[in-house]
Amino acid sequence: MKALGEVFSKLVEKIRGVSYIDEATLQELSREIQRALLKADVPLDMVKTFTENAVKRMREEKPPAGIPPREYVLYILYDELVKLLGGEQPAEFKPVKKPYLVLLLGVEGSGKTTTAAKLARYLVKRGYRVGLVETDTIRPAAFDQLKQLAEKIGVPFYGERDSKDAVEIARRGVQNFKNMDVVIIDTAGRHKNEEALLQEVKMIYEAVNPDEVILVIDATVGKLAAAQAEAFMKYLPIHSVIITKMDSTARGGGALAAVIKTGARVKFIGVGEDVDEFDLFNPRKFVARVLGMGDLDALVEKIKAVFEEEKVLQEIESGRLDLLTFKKQIEGLLKLGPLSKVLQLLPGGFAAKISEEQVELSQKNLKKWYAILSSMTIEELKNPDILNASRIRRIALGAGVTPKDVKEMLTVYENLKKMSKTLKRQLRMRIPK
């Protein structure tokens, strides 16, 4: 979502730089809002309505006591964007029967097969038993792609490489997974004008009677997402939508707005290539991140889950900040996911301010340090004082780095050790027990 965040960061900076809100300022902000929304590929009629509503509120509403006018203007922008993207209520995915059948649709290239695996991974992490069914008989690579992804995430897979009957594959796949909690059925990618393929997916729908039909849409299509959704809606009911590739384009905002305009519910967004880079869509948190307000709730929950699992907090609080604890901390940070995604959760627009090169370097350093620590013996991890030149050379060789790299990591460790009391206080404030 960095690309979308960059579109709005200039608008937010403009608002925060305003000392007095008069009519001239409102007219200027109106133009800036329209410019940002059009860059995000929001449909023109929605841009006009949004701008009129937002500026009207900015003109007529008075900020509460103690709130600077510019901060209240920013709040109005946030509030109107949340409304534009579906309102305060976050999406939910709760299978209500067993097996709960999910049918995935989408045009070719929308990321549908990868999304099938991401959804499966999301559900498995929440305790559901999931089966994946591949019915794409048009694209030969689809079978192998989903089979490999299923193996990667540890989910059972059903497909028939040589069959050309997608309807029968779907029917047999559902029967094969009748004892699962959720069955996800992937279908061939279709063009919205391909009558025969659209009829085929309708036949699959009638054969298996899915509990939920999810349309997968690529964010890069922007406002054209509405046409895709409406085309599929002519053939069968669309219960919800997943927007993919939100991390790679500024047009994702337009795709979201266009889909919501059709009455469809956006349930998930894909925010990266990894199977774990997949989130339930929460308009409030999404807008906060796009505007650079961050999503500290999400960040704290991520950190809490990782560090509670490793029991690192207790070790820091007991004063045992040795290299073994340091290794667990780095492992925990790596489990949070790519640093670029973590930065998007921070307020102040950090993700937009830090270059991709800096983020990539930090990520590489964490991985390098983890390799160094993994090359040490338990004795060395627990007693860093025994690390002499000979041991450092051996560790560097085992980690595929230079002795200088090892020494630099040890310097970072020593600095962290000195700061452990401050770190302890910060963690206690951020991560309640």
Swiss-Prot record:
- What GO terms describe the biological role, i.e. biological process, of this protein? SRP-dependent cotranslational protein targeting to membrane
| Matches recorded under SMART domains | AAA, SRP54, SRP54_N
Query: Which GO molecular function terms does the record list?
Result: 7S RNA binding; ATP hydrolysis activity; GTP binding; GTPase activity
Localization in the cell: Cytoplasm
Gene3D superfamilies found in the cross-reference section: P-loop containing nucleotide triphosphate hydrolases (3.40.50.300), Signal recognition particle SRP54, nucleotide-binding domain (1.20.120.140), Signal recognition particle, SRP54 subunit, M-domain (1.10.260.30)
Enzyme class label = hydrolase
Q: Which reaction does it catalyse?
A: GTP + H2O = GDP + phosphate + H(+)
Instruction: Locate the residues binding GTP.
Output: 106-113, 186-190, 244-247
Q: What is its EC number?
A: 3.6.5.4
* Cited PANTHER family: SIGNAL RECOGNITION PARTICLE 54K PROTEIN SRP54, SIGNAL RECOGNITION PARTICLE SUBUNIT SRP54
* Similarity field: Belongs to the GTP-binding SRP family. SRP54 subfamily.
Subunit architecture: Part of the signal recognition particle protein translocation system, which is composed of SRP and FtsY. Archaeal SRP consists of a 7S RNA molecule of 300 nucleotides and two protein subunits: SRP54 and SRP19.
Which function does this protein serve?
A: Involved in targeting and insertion of nascent membrane proteins into the cytoplasmic membrane. Binds to the hydrophobic signal sequence of the ribosome-nascent chain (RNC) as it emerges from the ribosomes. The SRP-RNC complex is then targeted to the cytoplasmic membrane where it interacts with the SRP receptor FtsY.
Q: What is known of its domains?
A: Composed of three domains: the N-terminal N domain, which is responsible for interactions with the ribosome, the central G domain, which binds GTP, and the C-terminal M domain, which binds the RNA and the signal sequence of the RNC.
Q: What is this protein called?
A: Signal recognition particle 54 kDa protein
This chain's source organism reads Pyrobaculum islandicum (strain DSM 4184 / JCM 9189 / GEO3)
